[in-house]
Amino acid sequence: MDDPDDPRLASGAAWRDLVAALARAEQRVLGPGVPATPRDRAEGFRHLLRFLVAGHLLCVEHADPNAPRFARMVDPAWPWGLDMPDCLYLFAPLRGDAVYRVWGSRGTANHVDFQVNWGHFALGDLSAWGTVASASDLELDFAPDGSFELWLGGSARPRNWLPLAPNAEFLLVRQYFGDWEQERPGDLAIERVGGAAPTPRPRSDEIAARIDRLVTWLDRGGALWERMSRGLVEGMAPNSLVVTRPADSAQRAGLRGQAYGIGNFQCMTEEAVIVRFDPPRCRHWSVSLANWWWESLDFGSRQTSLNFHQAGLDADGVFRGVIAHVDPGVPNWLDTAGHERGTVAIRFLLADEVPKVELERVTLRELAAALPRSTPRISPAERAACLTRRHNAVRHRYRG
């Protein structure tokens, strides 16, 4: 197949544009107002490397809609975009005029959702991507053993089918886990119907376009998450949070039926922040912490998140989590991992109502009096065992 040289690739100009974008990205670590302790700087530059890895996967390596493969869009090794610790995110590129078959086994996750999206996260604009169509495990048919097929595009089918659109760009699969130790991911594969085999070698213009998109990912995509994080940490009152349930529409790329509570925590070493709400009836709820760069905090070796299965409710049915730097000796501890400020993210999926969430900052000396007398205690040995189980569950989810 003919492949005339792309002049920007042949001359190295496209590559130099990428190198220049990496140089510009340092301002997201060294710029004004960014946390500047040695550990923050270390975490910031690690974030840039992680964000580059994520961008390479989404913009370069898994960018061929003619030969799609599922990739982990988010991973503990490359968290970004206020990712949810309960969720395994899978991504596959699409083209709107093709037909695709997704098949495999559902797994045992608490909730599974397939979402066809237009636009791309690299564009750095919330209005630049949205939903073409979606379906969850509540709407799909599965065999008794959990196996299934889902068709994308082409002629309409009565069941297990999602339409595409001319601007469709990718399929996003979300698997929500409640019981991390017992629930297992699905075994999923995707193919373009009628696709060529073997896969042709990439053309020079294709690689140039993918590098250009990676540049956009670094410039515009990275800037978006920084603006949103900075707006929460600096633009809202300390320890405040707002819960919203956006209307499901084609202009929204978030999970259908999910309400989001997003705010900030500010907590010094000798302080704690109590997160309090009355959980609604819903399919799934979770609370998690993130750093300045909107990376979920290390949820594999620390208890930086809790969900409806992991958390305990008090006798009055209220969830009370305790954000603190040191273990306060209560089961619902949310570990700051050394961060004095960051983002709090709360999600309620398919909730019958949206609850009010309160954040209250107290000193560690005041904490016991601020919690119900019946609040259970947890010993250091019990905490260590809990963290070991958590670590093993995360390793199992992301194995391979």
PLM features per residue range, with description:
Residues 1-400:
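A compositional/structural signature for long, glycine/proline-rich flexible linkers
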